[in-house]
């Protein structure tokens, strides 16, 4: 399983997803758009994310990419089935 995190603003939410991905055995996280990464643009650790991730940011493989669509296309070409989740007033 691979997860794509698209434009998630909160360091705390991303840190929590790293923890969940670690527990679920997720092979990789793609961090897209404005989604914060464990290492910031200056090469420094993201302390707010790391505080919530509890070390999972060091064990879960991740890649920061600008284009969510490019990541999706790459995964489709590799044979992955794409499933999307979104919060919406009309969501089931």
Q: Model-derived features: where do they sit?
A:
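RNA substrate-binding interface of SAM-dependent RNA methyltransferases
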Residues: 1-87
């Amino acid at each position: 399983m691979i997860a794509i995190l698209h434009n998630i603003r909160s360091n705390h939410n991303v840190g929590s997803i790293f923890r969940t991905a670690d527990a679920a055995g997720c092979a990789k996280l793609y961090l897209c758009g404005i989604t914060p990464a464990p290492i910031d643009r200056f090469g420094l650790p993201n302390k707010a994310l790391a505080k919530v991730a509890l070390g999972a940011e060091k064990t879960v493989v991740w890649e920061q990419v600008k284009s969510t669509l490019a990541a999706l296309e790459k995964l489709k070409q590799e044979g992955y089935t794409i499933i999307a989740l979104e919060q919406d007033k009309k969501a089931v």
